[in-house]
Protein backbone atom coordinates (compact mmCIF):
# COMPACT_ATOMS: atom_id res chain seq x y z
CA UNK A 1 0.00 0.00 0.00
CA UNK A 2 1.32 3.45 -0.89
CA UNK A 3 1.22 6.47 1.38
CA UNK A 4 0.22 10.06 0.62
CA UNK A 5 1.34 12.95 2.82
CA UNK A 6 0.08 16.53 2.78
CA UNK A 7 1.95 19.12 4.83
CA UNK A 8 0.92 22.74 5.28
CA UNK A 9 3.55 25.50 5.41
CA UNK A 10 5.54 25.25 8.63
CA UNK A 11 4.83 21.54 9.08
CA UNK A 12 6.64 18.48 7.77
CA UNK A 13 6.75 14.82 8.85
CA UNK A 14 9.66 13.91 11.08
CA UNK A 15 12.69 12.69 9.11
CA UNK A 16 12.40 9.22 10.68
CA UNK A 17 8.76 9.04 9.53
CA UNK A 18 9.69 9.94 5.95
CA UNK A 19 12.36 7.24 5.99
CA UNK A 20 9.89 4.66 7.36
CA UNK A 21 7.33 5.61 4.69
CA UNK A 22 9.93 5.16 1.95
CA UNK A 23 11.19 1.84 3.31
CA UNK A 24 7.64 0.44 3.53
CA UNK A 25 6.84 1.72 0.02
CA UNK A 26 10.11 1.25 -1.89
CA UNK A 27 8.93 1.50 -5.50
CA UNK A 28 9.41 5.22 -6.06
CA UNK A 29 8.10 8.47 -4.79
CA UNK A 30 7.78 12.15 -5.31
CA UNK A 31 7.16 15.51 -3.76
CA UNK A 32 5.33 18.48 -5.24
CA UNK A 33 5.33 21.89 -3.59
CA UNK A 34 4.33 25.46 -4.30
CA UNK A 35 7.32 27.82 -4.26
CA UNK A 36 5.20 30.97 -4.04
CA UNK A 37 5.04 31.36 -7.81
CA UNK A 38 4.43 27.91 -9.27
CA UNK A 39 4.31 24.22 -8.53
CA UNK A 40 7.54 22.27 -8.49
CA UNK A 41 8.03 18.52 -8.47
CA UNK A 42 10.78 15.98 -7.81
CA UNK A 43 10.19 12.27 -8.50
CA UNK A 44 12.42 9.21 -8.53
CA UNK A 45 12.00 5.42 -8.71
CA UNK A 46 14.19 5.22 -5.60
CA UNK A 47 12.15 6.48 -2.66
CA UNK A 48 15.33 7.02 -0.65
CA UNK A 49 16.41 9.60 -3.24
CA UNK A 50 13.11 11.39 -2.66
CA UNK A 51 13.79 11.37 1.09
CA UNK A 52 17.32 12.67 0.38
CA UNK A 53 15.91 15.44 -1.80
CA UNK A 54 13.48 16.46 0.93
CA UNK A 55 16.28 16.44 3.54
CA UNK A 56 18.62 18.50 1.34
CA UNK A 57 15.87 21.07 0.64
CA UNK A 58 14.33 20.94 4.13
CA UNK A 59 14.44 24.68 4.83
CA UNK A 60 12.58 25.46 1.61
CA UNK A 61 10.08 22.58 1.68
CA UNK A 62 9.16 22.89 5.36
CA UNK A 63 7.72 26.35 4.69
CA UNK A 64 5.84 25.41 1.53
CA UNK A 65 2.66 23.40 1.08
CA UNK A 66 3.78 19.90 0.04
CA UNK A 67 2.21 16.79 -1.44
CA UNK A 68 4.44 13.73 -0.91
CA UNK A 69 3.90 10.17 -2.15
CA UNK A 70 5.76 6.89 -1.67
CA UNK A 71 4.75 4.00 -3.94
CA UNK A 72 4.31 0.30 -3.43
CA UNK A 73 3.80 -1.02 -6.97
CA UNK A 74 0.71 -3.19 -7.38
CA UNK A 75 -0.08 -2.28 -11.01
CA UNK A 76 2.56 -1.11 -13.45
CA UNK A 77 6.31 -1.38 -13.46
CA UNK A 78 8.68 0.38 -11.11
CA UNK A 79 9.40 3.15 -13.61
CA UNK A 80 9.64 6.96 -13.63
CA UNK A 81 6.35 7.34 -15.50
CA UNK A 82 4.51 5.54 -12.68
CA UNK A 83 5.86 7.70 -9.85
CA UNK A 84 3.35 10.03 -8.24
CA UNK A 85 2.35 12.81 -8.02
CA UNK A 86 0.95 13.12 -11.56
CA UNK A 87 0.53 16.49 -13.27
CA UNK A 88 -2.91 17.68 -14.36
CA UNK A 89 -4.36 21.10 -15.23
CA UNK A 90 -5.69 21.14 -11.65
CA UNK A 91 -2.23 20.63 -10.16
CA UNK A 92 -0.47 17.47 -9.02
CA UNK A 93 -2.44 14.45 -7.81
CA UNK A 94 -1.41 11.37 -5.80
CA UNK A 95 -3.31 8.14 -5.14
CA UNK A 96 -3.16 5.48 -2.43
CA UNK A 97 -4.92 2.15 -2.87
CA UNK A 98 -6.05 0.09 -5.83
CA UNK A 99 -8.32 1.76 -8.36
CA UNK A 100 -10.30 -1.40 -9.10
CA UNK A 101 -12.48 0.33 -11.71
CA UNK A 102 -9.34 1.24 -13.66
CA UNK A 103 -7.18 -1.90 -13.60
CA UNK A 104 -7.73 -2.28 -17.36
CA UNK A 105 -6.90 0.63 -19.64
CA UNK A 106 -4.23 2.16 -21.83
CA UNK A 107 -1.65 2.21 -19.01
CA UNK A 108 -0.25 -0.59 -16.84
CA UNK A 109 -0.88 1.61 -13.82
CA UNK A 110 -4.40 1.65 -12.39
CA UNK A 111 -3.69 5.12 -11.00
CA UNK A 112 -2.66 6.52 -14.38
CA UNK A 113 -5.84 5.04 -15.91
CA UNK A 114 -7.92 6.63 -13.13
CA UNK A 115 -6.25 10.03 -13.48
CA UNK A 116 -6.75 9.93 -17.27
CA UNK A 117 -10.47 9.11 -16.77
CA UNK A 118 -10.75 11.96 -14.24
CA UNK A 119 -9.20 14.41 -16.71
CA UNK A 120 -11.35 13.11 -19.58
CA UNK A 121 -14.49 13.52 -17.44
CA UNK A 122 -13.74 17.21 -16.95
CA UNK A 123 -12.47 16.51 -13.42
CA UNK A 124 -15.70 14.94 -12.17
CA UNK A 125 -14.76 13.76 -8.66
CA UNK A 126 -17.34 10.95 -8.87
CA UNK A 127 -14.72 9.14 -11.00
CA UNK A 128 -12.51 8.93 -7.89
CA UNK A 129 -15.22 7.62 -5.56
CA UNK A 130 -14.36 4.30 -3.95
CA UNK A 131 -10.93 4.09 -5.59
CA UNK A 132 -8.81 4.70 -2.48
CA UNK A 133 -7.34 7.96 -1.20
CA UNK A 134 -6.62 10.84 -3.57
CA UNK A 135 -4.94 14.14 -2.71
CA UNK A 136 -4.20 17.21 -4.82
CA UNK A 137 -1.99 20.28 -4.63
CA UNK A 138 -3.48 23.03 -6.77
CA UNK A 139 -1.48 25.42 -9.00
CA UNK A 140 -1.54 27.96 -6.14
CA UNK A 141 -0.52 25.53 -3.40
CA UNK A 142 -3.88 24.59 -1.88
CA UNK A 143 -3.86 21.05 -0.49
CA UNK A 144 -7.06 19.03 -0.95
CA UNK A 145 -8.09 15.48 -0.12
CA UNK A 146 -10.49 14.52 -2.91
CA UNK A 147 -11.20 11.00 -1.69
CA UNK A 148 -10.46 8.96 1.42
CA UNK A 149 -10.21 9.84 5.09
CA UNK A 150 -6.74 11.19 5.91
CA UNK A 151 -5.20 10.63 9.32
CA UNK A 152 -3.64 13.47 11.32
CA UNK A 153 -0.01 12.47 11.86
CA UNK A 154 1.01 15.65 13.63
CA UNK A 155 0.04 19.31 13.49
CA UNK A 156 -0.37 20.28 9.85
CA UNK A 157 0.58 16.85 8.48
CA UNK A 158 -2.04 14.43 7.13
CA UNK A 159 -1.36 10.91 5.82
CA UNK A 160 -3.48 8.45 3.86
CA UNK A 161 -2.59 5.60 6.24
CA UNK A 162 -0.19 4.54 8.96
CA UNK A 163 0.69 1.02 7.71
CA UNK A 164 4.29 2.19 7.32
CA UNK A 165 4.51 2.50 11.13
CA UNK A 166 4.19 -1.27 11.68
What are the language-model segments listed below?
Residues 2-6, 28-36, 68, 84-86, ...:
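Short beta-strand scaffold segments in enzyme catalytic cores
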Residues 10-11, 72-74, 98-99, 141:
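Short, glycine-/Ser/Thr-/acidic-enriched flexible segments
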Amino acid sequence: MCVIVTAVPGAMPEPADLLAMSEANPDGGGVSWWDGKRLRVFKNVDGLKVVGYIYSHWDRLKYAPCLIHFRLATHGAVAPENCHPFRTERGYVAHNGIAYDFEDGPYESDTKNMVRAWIDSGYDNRILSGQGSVALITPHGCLKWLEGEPVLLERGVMVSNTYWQL
